[in-house]
Amino acid sequence: MVDLEQEFALGGRCLAFHGPLMYEAKILKIWDPSSKMYTSIPNDKPGGSSQATKEIKPQKLGEDESIPEEIINGKCFFIHYQGWKSSWDEWVGYDRIRAYNEENIAMKKRLANEAKEAKKSLLEQQKKKKLSTSLGGPSNGGKRKGDSRSNASISKSTSQSFLTSSVSGRKSGRSSANSLHPGSSLRSSSDQNGNDDRRRSSSLSPNMLHHIAGYPTPKISLQIPIKLKSVLVDDWEYVTKDKKICRLPADVTVEMVLNKYEHEVSQELESPGSQSQLSEYCAGLKLYFDKCLGNMLLYRLERLQYDELLKKSSKDQKPLVPIRIYGAIHLLRLISVLPELISSTTMDLQSCQLLIKQTEDFLVWLLMHVDEYFNDKDPNRSDDALYVNTSSQYEGVALGM
C-alpha cells in the first residue's frame, strides 16, 4: 500500500498536472476535510527552503482564501509550480498530484516530448499547406471538398462499427460524469498507460481517492489523431499562456456538432438497432458534457466566464445548458479524458472497448471537419474566431478565484 502521507508531505516536492503536461511543484498547504482546517509551512513563500517543514497549528481558511467546492470534501494540497509566479499557486486534489519519483518523472518527460512532436507535426503540415497554395495547389475549400468526396467511404467503415458497438454498459458509469474539479488539467493524448488516473471524481470517498492515487488504472487506450492532439495543445497555450478564453456562445455548439454527426452517420446505417445505438452514443456524450463541464473541462482562467453564465441563467430563471453554449474544442477536451471516466466506472472490459471504438470513429469524423470546427482564424473576421483576449482586470479576478 502506498504511504500517501509520506509521498505528499508538507513542504515536499511533487509533480502536478497543469494543461496536458506535468510540472514540478512544492506543497505549501494541506487541507484536512475532517477538521475543515489546513496546515502550512512557516513563511510559505515559493522561494523558501523546503527543509523548513516545521508545521504550525491548523488554521481556518481566511476570508480571501477559498478551495474549489469540487475538491473541498477530500484531502487536497495548495501547491506552487517551480519557476512560476505565485499567482499560479492553486489547490489540487489527488486527481492531479503525483509523487515525485522516477516513474512519474519519466511520465513528465514523455508528455513533454509528445507535446513537442504534436506541435512539430502541425507546423510541418502548415508549411506544406502554404507551399501547396503558393504553387497553385488546391485551396482549403478544395481540400474540404475532396475530403467530402471520400467521406462516404470513411463513413461507411465508421458506420459498420456501430453495428456491433453498444453503450449499454455506459449506464453504470453515468455517476462518474460529475467527476473532477474546476480547472483540472487536460491531456493532449489519452494513450499513455498508467496515467489515466489523473483526474478522478472529488465526489468519491477519500479512501477511494487514496486507492486511485496509489495504483494505476486499467489500460484503456484511446487513439487520438495527431492533428487533434495538436489542437488540444494549441488550446492549452491559448488559455494558459496567451490568456485567451473561448468566445461564447460558440458559433457551432456541442449540440450542433453531435446532431450533425448523428445525422450524417445514420444515413449510412440500415439497421434500426444500429441507428438506435448511434443515437444513444450521441445522447450519452451530451449528457456527459453537461455534467462534466463545470467540474473538469475548464481551465482556471475560464472559471469566471462560467460563473458569470451561471449567474445569468439564475437571474433569467433558466437552466444553463452547456451543450448549447460551448463549442467543439470543449467537446474535444471531454473526449480526451473519456478513458479516465470509463475506467472509474463498473463497466466490463468489453463494454469499455466498444465505447472506445465508437469514440475513435467519432474522432475520425472530427478529423475530417477539423478546419470547420477548430480553425482559430475566420476569414470573415478580423479577430480570432474561437478565442478572445481577456482584460487585465478579468485575469486578476479569474486567477484569484
UniProtKB/Swiss-Prot annotation:
Domain Tudor-knot stretches: 13-98
GO biological process, one term: transcription elongation by RNA polymerase II
InterPro entries attached to this UniProt entry: Chromo-like_dom_sf, Chromo/chromo_shadow_dom, MRG, MRG_C_sf, MRG_dom, MSL3_chromo-like
Keywords, comma-separated and alphabetical: Chromatin regulator, DNA damage, DNA repair, Nucleus, Phosphoprotein, Transcription, Transcription regulation
All copies of domain MRG, residue ranges: 216-399
Major subcellular site: nucleus
SMART domains: CHROMO (SM00298)
Protein name: Chromatin modification-related protein EAF3
Compartment(s): Nucleus
Function: Component of the NuA4 histone acetyltransferase complex which is involved in transcriptional activation of selected genes principally by acetylation of nucleosomal histone H4 and H2A. The NuA4 complex is also involved in DNA repair.
Note: Present with 1890 molecules/cell in log phase SD medium.
Biased composition range(s): Low complexity: 153-190
Gene Ontology CC annotations of this record: histone acetyltransferase complex; NuA4 histone acetyltransferase complex; nucleosome disassembly/reassembly complex; nucleus; Rpd3S complex
Comp. bias regions, Basic and acidic residues: 54-63, 117-126
Source organism, top-level taxon: Eukaryota
Family: Belongs to the MRG family.
Subunit details: Component of the NuA4 histone acetyltransferase complex composed of at least ACT1, ARP4, YAF9, VID21, SWC4, EAF3, EAF5, EAF6, EAF7, EPL1, ESA1, TRA1 and YNG2.
Region (Disordered): 39-65, 117-210
This protein's encoding gene: EAF3
